[in-house]
Swiss-Prot record:
Its cofactor is pyridoxal 5'-phosphate. GO terms for molecular function: D-serine ammonia-lyase activity; hydro-lyase activity; pyridoxal phosphate binding. It comes from Photobacterium profundum (strain SS9). Pfam families: PALP. This is Probable D-serine dehydratase.
Amino acid sequence: MSTLNIQQLVTEFPLVEKLIALDDVSWFNPNITTLAEGLPYVGLDKTDIKDASDRLKRFAPYLAKAFPETAKTNGIIESDVVAIPAMKTVLEQQYHIAIQGTLLLKKDSHLPISGSIKARGGIYEVLTHAEKLAIQAGLLSESDDYSKLFTDEFRAFFKQFSIAVGSTGNLGMSIGIMSAKIGFSVSVHMSADARQWKKDKLRSHGVIVVEYKEDYGVAVAQGRKEAEKDPTCFFIDDENSPTLFLGYSVAGERLKSQFEAMNILVDELHPLFVYLPCGVGGGPGGVAFGLKMAFGDNVHCIFAEPTHSPCMLLGIHTGLHDEISVQDIGIDNITAADGLAVGRGSGFVGRAMERLLDGFYTISDERMYHHLGEMSKYEDIQLEPSALAGMLGPVVVSDNEEYLQRIQMDEQKLKNATHLVWATGGGMVPSEEMASYLAKSGI
């Protein structure tokens, strides 16, 4: 984009100037529609989510065997929902604002196998590919007990095939660990932001890690290019994969069941606000789609991005989607929130979900670190910086009278509201790495 175009962009979209200045900004989507109006643009529906859910159930006996940590949930990879009342009080005091309703945390940070939200989509896409190959080869049918995949015979079969992915860290972890376990040869192309411990962990599982000095976009492009040379290699495309998206979407019906068990009501008088950290957009986009299918217009999904990597906000706000990157407007895409260090958002997710997302906001690294320290001190929950992007959400929403009026959110509804912060990673961070995070928090 030329300088002239940037000037035109700023004239047309004044918010872009604040993004360029790296200010904390929020934008509530004036183009949001009902689920009924917005759903056709997604190109997927509840039958697709059911298909994904059924596939994960078929694989549950295999997962329970292959990963003993999932045995207690019978091979279903799911995370807890916990109340964080002390954190709510801290936020209210810190930002001098009353947050009505209940504040909860979704602990995808502590999902088994890879310790992040990416355990949903990444593992699902690997399993989908494995199932397809095994069925095509006549080795598996959908009525089989899938625990038979945990044998040397199947590992030898899958060894003929390879998988590649580009990642800032967590997606690579989930795809690398899952692929290696099932038997695939797997290479993970990792951007400059990727943490050393994540690379070390992958290598300990026999994964080939290819390192880049450039950002996420370059790692993905190179991974794609390498895969194209090998007909037996399957490239998992974080930017454009409906399969990954569906893996994440199953979270909606799962959360609905958890809420029912916890006697948490979600309806027109009891709204649900969900705050999702956003990198390229596949994880939060898929989860938001699943939430919309589970709770309809009574759930309000808000994406949180680092001030240095506001790719999805930039793409949806301007309508340019993946035709613009944060680098085009002079933003460096360098952030401590390594899982969110993405300069160009997914065009697939942006176009699919732009009518179903209530809003976006940006948050500085300093705030993420500060909230990381507070979560550890007051709730004894340890998270990585990316996972704290959502923590500012209840403050941003509570402080925006115009948005609350537009969605007809009166005092009573707000008192009945549930605020859910989606913690995306941190459960597998080594203790010395966590100590350095806590030291930076200033708490």
